[in-house]
From Swiss-Prot:
Disulfide bonds: none
Family (UniProt): Belongs to the cation transport ATPase (P-type) (TC 3.A.3) family.
UniProt topology in membrane: Multi-pass membrane protein
Binding site for Ca(2+) 1: N768, E771, T799, D800, E908
Alphabetized Gene3D superfamilies for the sequence: Calcium-transporting ATPase, cytoplasmic domain N, Calcium-transporting ATPase, cytoplasmic transduction domain A, Calcium-transporting ATPase, transmembrane domain, HAD superfamily/HAD-like
Protein name according to UniProt: Calcium-transporting ATPase sarcoplasmic/endoplasmic reticulum type
Keywords: ATP-binding, Calcium, Calcium transport, Endoplasmic reticulum, Ion transport, Magnesium, Membrane, Metal-binding, Nucleotide-binding, Phosphoprotein, Sarcoplasmic reticulum, Translocase, Transmembrane, Transmembrane helix, Transport
Positions that bind Mg(2+): D703, D707
Lumenal side of membrane: 70-89, 274-295, 778-787, 852-897, 950-964
Record: active site: D351
Length: 1002
């Protein structure tokens, strides 16, 4: 039933043909079960394990590697016997890499849809219904409840379906619907129709939402929605329809993979094609087919060389290290790729309550009368510090610190705060923090009384828990609460009837302590307390009080005000009808006004500075809240989202105002706004959608079930540590401390991680380009193999992998939060960066081939061949004067390959040092600024020596130990790479990479 809130009780019952006293008949129940289905959220049909496994191989680079492995395996079957073992190493290693990557991918996918399943925890198991087949109330399984059923709920019950209230049996019924609407205090419900068909969930005061909890009271209602037709069911539908989007890094790596695959294909075909003339060379036994296969193997080796197999592992390791650093800053990352996405966040959409504020209501101002002479009067206006539930704070009057015990009226005010109250504060030892037990507003009054300590209780030597209840304990020795007249909507107040336990300044008789909305309480006040005396309260004095509370409730503070009063001679309990709440108004009469307290959910101390940092970093902060517009704007001024005098026209919208705009106007509003108030979940999702259409990268915070679709849709969903399991499951990140400034720290960490990733990607790619150039040169020039596939895999995975991982520990640049966020569509490799890759890569390839050629031609320990002999080595077996005296086996001597491999490894270690910074010289950023890098370089060299000097490994990798002369030559070929990169960095600093300045568009 749509718009059930706008229908009267009778209309709602008639819609389903429900008897308001006896419920549905069995026939009606069966009909409705067939029509509407079971009252449950359907189980998500996940992908099978084999579907997930196959998806992991749906990637171009992976397909190329898989093809290379299959071809290598087939070719290995035709190898000569002595080479069979080494031939199988290459395809085996490639397959192991692919399997490891697939396992990680499947594991991540398996966790992806847990958010939808987490919604199940909000489904109640049982419900209490009234049906015509049995008399009285019967318990049934919640999934058997149908639209039209009469359901009864009471304190502690979980609402089993969306219910339109028809009757309230208690004074009031309060519902904790924070999981659905984000409201921090429980909501008082009623049975009246709400005529607005477009009312948001917060305003549907006659609807009990499925999955929410009854905080107080007892009521009956008719079910208007079950299963997917409930508010929580609609959220489930929205979440299941939300498509997962790839992170900017994943998109860039996909693009990079496509480009690389095209380049690989062209080079492989080119290498094979340019050697067609050598297919019949004597080295292949004069067989054209054997020659074709030989060069096909070289093409496969080229593919293996070009793909950075170690890149996925290094990226995963770097992101995992980033998550550990973020965890220390209270940001728990659930999705690894989102770590990098944080670095390009351009908009943070933040919830107000609990994220920008403490979510701990706190009294900041209060007033009492100083003097009253006729209509001439003056007030004492106090201010209090402290913004949490821990009762620590100072009392100020006119900027001067004062003691509450010096003001008699404050003793009475503190007494009203404690006695007219059903809440408390509790010390949570695990969290080492104070928490509310009951209503936030009442808890603020308890904390106020403790801060005031108006009766000067000695708190010295008390532990934190005892210190926090000392003033309450003192007041409760003076008064005993007999009963409470609960809050009701008609009078907007509550009161407690108390009797004295011992004599006090307030007299010896019973009192009725009252608190409530200022207008309602003042209407029933006849007198006012001034010190210890009591004076008549004229209409002029009432107007002055209301004018002051009006100021408190608007402007910068927008405080929630409560008036406190006392009935000095209350009506006797025996003359009260406590069973009829409509008569409570008659008992709260002849009141004496005591004072007004103004409270707010105060901003967190660190938020203002965090927003200043966001502005400096070019990040827009949009506050999205369920609060009313005036309160939200006041908080935004306090935290720096708006300046004190800034006109918010066109920058602040309520949910209703936003809905009234055309689509074009809505997009324009999202482009410039900084505040959306009184919003619903679909507003959040729509805002994210529009931001994504503008190529903005948005981080969205939330804590309730209602926030889950937007959290899932945003590039970065950020759930609160105190939030619901659904929100946490849908989010990429969880804030352990619910603190906005932790988001800013995480963004800074994300930027640093991206910079480091660029460095190690550059490092690995230049290495791969070097390997490709090496193989291309040997094939194009007709030289013997300088590097074989198993060596390339060793370099790509192990030797290069360790320094690449260590580059993830590079310290962040000092000006990292003074630059604008990078654009999501910014290429991973710019034109200038590509030129640098090619320049370094070409040198790596040339030096590697040059080292092998040096051993053949110029080494004192080598064969002393001519360049012509070397480039025509495949003709050696055919005889001829050109190869007279040359042993043709020398062309497959492992020494030349060892020289090439050693130069490649050494250059890569020096190149790792070059990658400490994109543009900073090694003079200004020396290697020891990252000790992890020095350690990894040492380990890589050690591993290289192991494969050279351990016989079994040297056989597998076809290498051999080098002499001192050969090592000196290796260094001569390697060191120039540092000079080349320093030159390129100098050019970049002066010309190519001038950073953009941050422009504050908002």
């Amino acid at each position: 039933m749509e718009d059930g809130h706008s229908k009267t009780v009778e209309q709602s019952l008639n819609f389903f043909g429900t008897d308001g006293e006896r419920g549905l008949t069995l026939d009606q129940i069966k009909t409705n079960q067939a029509k509407y289905g079971p009252n449950e959220l359907p189980t998500e049909e996940g992908k099978s394990i084999w579907q997930l496994v196959l998806e992991q191989f749906d990637d171009l680079l992976v397909k190329i590697l898989l093809l290379a492995a299959i071809i290598s395996f087939v070719l290995a079957l035709f190898e000569e016997h002595e080479e069979t073992f080494t031939a199988f190493v290459e395809p085996l290693v490639i397959l192991l890499i692919l399997i490891a990557n697939a396992v990680v991918g499947v594991w991540q996918e398996r966790n992806a849809e847990s958010a939808i399943e987490a919604l199940k925890e909000y489904e109640p198991e049982m419900g209490k219904v009234i049906r015509q087949d049995k008399s009285g109330i019967q318990k049934v399984r919640a999934k058997e409840i149908v639209p039209g059923d009469l359901v009864e709920v009471s304190v502690g019950d979980k609402i089993p379906a969306d219910i339109r209230l028809t009757h309230i049996y208690s004074t009031t019924i309060r519902i904790d619907q924070s999981i659905l609407t984000g409201e921090s205090v429980s909501v008082i419900k009623h049975t009246d129709a709400i005529p607005d068909p477009r009312a948001v969930n917060q305003d549907k005061k006659n609807i009990l939402f499925s999955g929410t909890n009854v905080a107080a009271g007892k009521a009956r209602g008719v079910v208007i929605g079950t299963g997917l037709s409930t508010a929580i069911g609609k959220i489930r539908t929205e979440m299941s329809e939300t498509e997962e989007i790839k992170t900017p890094l994943q998109q860039k790596l996909d693009e990079f993979g496509e480009q690389l695959s095209k380049v690989i294909s062209v080079i492989c075909v080119a290498v094979w094609a340019i050697n067609i003339g050598h297919f019949n060379d004597p080295a292949h036994g004069g067989s054209w087919i054997k020659g074709a296969i030989y060069y096909f193997k070289i093409a496969v080796a080229l593919a293996v060389a070009a793909i950075p197999e170690g890149l996925p592992a290094v990226i995963t390791t770097c992101l995992a290290l980033g998550t550990r650093r973020m965890a220390k800053k209270n940001a728990i990352v659930r999705s690894l790729p989102s770590v990098e996405t944080l670095g390009c966040t351009s908009v943070i959409c933040s919830d107000k309550t609990g994220t920008l504020t403490t979510n701990q209501m706190s009294v900041s101002r209060m007033l009492i009368f100083e003097k009253v002479e006729g209509n001439d009067s003056s007030f004492l206006e106090f201010e209090l510090t402290g913004s949490t539930y821990e009762p620590i704070g100072e009392l100020f009057l006119g900027g001067q610190r004062v003691k509450a015990s010096d003001y008699e009226a404050l003793q009475e005010l503190a007494t009203v705060c404690i006695m007219c109250n059903d809440s408390a504060i509790d010390y949570n030892e695990f969290k080492a923090a104070f928490e509310k037990v009951g209503e936030a507003t009442e808890t603020a009054l308890i904390v106020l009384a403790e801060k005031l300590n108006a009766f000067s209780v000695n708190k010295s030597g008390l532990d934190r828990r005892s210190n926090a209840i000392a003033a309450r304990g003192e007041i409760e020795t003076k008064w005993k609460k007999e009963f409470t007249l609960e809050f009701s909507r008609d009078r907007k107040s509550m009161s407690s009837y108390c009797t004295p336990l011992k004599a006090s300044r307030l007299g010896t008789g019973p009192k009725l302590f009252v608190k409530g909305a200022p207008e309602g309480v003042l209407d029933r006040c006849t007198h006012a307390r001034v010190g210890t005396s009591k004076v008549p309260l004229t209409s002029a004095l009432k107007a002055k009080i209301l004018a002051l509370t009006g100021q408190y409730g608007t402007g910068r503070d927008t405080l929630r005000c409560l008036a406190l009063a006392v009935a000095d001679s209350p009506i006797r309990p025996e003359d009260m009808d406590l069973g009829d709440s409509t008569k409570f108004y008659q008992y709260e009469v002849n009141l004496t006004f005591v004072g007004v307290v103004g409270m707010l959910d105060p901003p967190r101390k660190e938020v203002f500075d965090a927003i200043v940092r966001c502005r400096a970093a070019g990040i827009r902060v949009i506050v999205i809240t369920g609060d009313n517009k005036a309160t939200a704007e006041a908080i935004c001024r306090r935290i720096g989202v708006f300046t004190e005098e800034e006109d918010t026209t066109g920058k602040s919208y309520s949910g209703r105002e936003f809905d009234d705009l055309s689509i074009a106007e809505q997009k324009a509003a999202v482009a410039r706004s900084r505040l959306f108030s009184r919003v619903e979940p679909q507003h959040k999702s729509k805002i994210v959608e529009y931001l994504q259409g503008m190529n903005e990268i948005s981080a969205m915070t939330g804590d309730g079930v209602n926030d889950a679709p937007a959290l899932k849709k945003a590039e970065i969903g950020i759930a609160m540590g105190s939030g619901t399991a659904v929100a946490k499951s849908a989010a990429e990140m969880v804030l352990a401390d619910d603190n906005f400034s932790s988001i800013v720290s995480a963004v800074e960490e994300g930027r640093a991680i991206y910079n480091n990733m660029k460095q190690f990607i550059r490092y690995l790619i230049s290495s791969n380009i070097g390997e490709v150039v090496s193989i291309f040169l040997t094939a194009a020039l007709g030289l013997p193999e300088a590097l074989i596939p198993v060596q390339l895999l060793w370099v790509n995975l192990v030797t290069d992998g360790l320094p690449a991982t260590a580059l993830g520990f590079n310290p962040p640049d000092l000006d990292i939060m003074d630059k604008p966020p990078r654009k999501a569509d910014e290429g991973l490799i710019s034109g200038w960066l590509f030129f640098r890759y090619m320049a370094i890569g070409f040198y790596v390839g040339a030096a590697t081939v040059g080292a092998a050629a040096w051993w053949f031609i110029a080494s004192s320990e080598g064969p002393g061949l001519t360049y012509w002999q070397l480039t025509h080595h495949l003709s050696c077996l055919g005889g001829g004067d050109e190869f007279k005296g040359v042993d043709c086996k020398i062309f497959s001597d492992p020494k030349a390959m060892t020289m090439a491999l050693s130069v490649l490894v050494t250059i890569e270690m020096l190149n790792a040092m070059n990658s400490l910074s994109e543009n900073q010289s090694l003079i200004s950023m020396p290697p020891w600024c990252n000790l992890w890098l020095i350690g990894s370089m040492a380990l890589s060299f050690t591993l290289h020596f192991v494969i050279l000097y351990v016989d079994v490994l040297s056989t597998v990798f076809q290498v051999t130990p080098l002499s001192a002369e050969e090592w000196i030559t290796v260094m001569k070929f390697s060191i120039p790479v540092v000079l080349l990169d320093e030159t390129l960095k100098f050019v970049a600093r002066k010309i190519a990479d001038v950073p953009d300045a941050v422009v504050d568009k908002w």
